[in-house]
């Protein structure tokens, strides 16, 4: 029954995406042009990759509000190292490890001090946003040495034919994460931890370790998204990652994951991320003022949470 319900939710999200594409195509035929649609998928990359980590977390019953700040901090760190002509591969690895370290800090704060994830990661969101500003001196960082721009790290911002390489990277990450979630013990443990933590502990699952792993993955993929952004843009603005956490959480919840834990899929998250990108791109094409765009995403997020709450109550009664 649960498998049928999960498939029904995924099918519903896919139908929403298809309906949006049809409506926007009717309103602005340019929306479905190959160039624009590839751009929509490319715009999904950063949100999508970060949402992979958030999916693991939300399934295990937690969330991370600091992902945008991790994106900004690791991006500024990598850009500073690039600017200093540090070996690009080493700079890349340092940034990814920094993301893992921040994720580890979040995980320890939540599991060992029992501070609610919302409060703990809200605190680290503010802390590491300040760190990002401190690293950059409040200035955007750009114009990197040729040894950096010619390296494989910056190739991530290029294209393979008409398709941006970052889209292939996102696809690989989603496929691997989907397999881990659906076919491995680690994935089972995350579902068990979020679905019924007491029962999970009774059968020998270390729920604290599962949650810490989720936070580490979230930090790592947020840092990776920042590296891809640098490679594509060739710069890091001072506002890098600001507000990104809301888009990421919205994508996961739209994709059918439950804020109460124990439910969600990578396919659903990908479709949710696509919906966010389609809506944002469509609003630009329809000349909707920028200040309404985030407001609309907020409304969509509230509706998704209300639907999740309704479905959770229905499941409990059933």
Each language-model region and where it sits:
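Transmembrane helix-bundle core of multi-pass membrane transporters
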Residues: 117-184, 210-213, 233-241, 316-318
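Loop-to-transmembrane alpha-helix initiation sites
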Residues: 10, 42-43, 88, 117, ...
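Single transmembrane alpha-helix segments in multi-pass membrane proteins
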Residues: 22-84, 109-114, 256-266, 299
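Cytosolic-side transmembrane-helix boundaries in multi-pass membrane proteins
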Residues: 1-20, 175, 195, 202-209, ...
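Transmembrane alpha-helical segments in multi-pass inner-membrane proteins
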Residues: 222, 233-298
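Inter-helical junctions in multi-pass inner-membrane proteins, predominant
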Residues: 29-39, 133-135, 180-187, 214-250, ...
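Helix-loop-helix "hairpin" substructures at the membrane interface of multi-pass membrane proteins
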Residues: 87-95, 101-106, 110, 159-236
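Short loop segments and helix-boundary regions at transmembrane helix junctions
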Residues: 2-5, 63, 101-142, 180-185, ...
């Amino acid at each position: 029954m649960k498998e049928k319900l999960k498939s029904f939710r995924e099918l519903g999200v896919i139908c929403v995406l298809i309906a949006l594409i049809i409506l926007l195509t009717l309103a602005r035929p340019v929306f479905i042009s190959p160039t624009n649609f590839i751009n929509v998928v490319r715009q999904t990359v950063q949100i999508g990759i970060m949402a992979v980590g958030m999916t693991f977390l939300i399934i295990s019953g937690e969330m991370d509000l600091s992902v945008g700040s991790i994106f900004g901090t690791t991006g500024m760190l990598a850009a500073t190292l690039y600017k200093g002509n540090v070996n690009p591969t080493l700079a890349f690895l340092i940034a990814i490890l920094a993301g893992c370290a921040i994720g580890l800090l979040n995980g320890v704060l939540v599991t060992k001090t029992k501070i609610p994830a919302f409060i703990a990661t809200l605190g680290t969101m503010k802390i590491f946003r300040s760190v990002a500003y401190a690293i950059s001196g409040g200035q955007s960082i750009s114009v990197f040495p040729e040894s950096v721009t010619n390296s494989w790290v910056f190739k991530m911002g290029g294209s393979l034919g008409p398709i941006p390489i970052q889209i292939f990277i996102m696809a690989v990450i989603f496929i691997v994460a989907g397999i881990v979630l659906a076919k491995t013990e680690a994935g089972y443990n995350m579902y068990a931890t979020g679905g019924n933590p007491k029962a999970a502990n009774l059968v020998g699952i270390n729920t604290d370790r599962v949650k810490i792993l989720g936070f580490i993955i979230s930090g790592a993929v947020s840092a990776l998204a920042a590296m891809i952004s640098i490679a594509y843009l060739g710069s890091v603005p001072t506002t890098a990652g600001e507000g990104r956490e809301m888009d990421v959480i919205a994508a996961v919840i739209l994709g059918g994951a439950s804020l109460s834990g124990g439910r969600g899929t990578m396919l659903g998250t990908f479709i949710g991320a696509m919906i966010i990108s389609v809506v944002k791109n469509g609003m630009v094409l329809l000349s909707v003022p920028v200040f309404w765009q985030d407001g609309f995403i907020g409304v969509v997020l509230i509706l998704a949470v209300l639907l999740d709450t309704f479905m959770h109550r229905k499941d409990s009664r059933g």
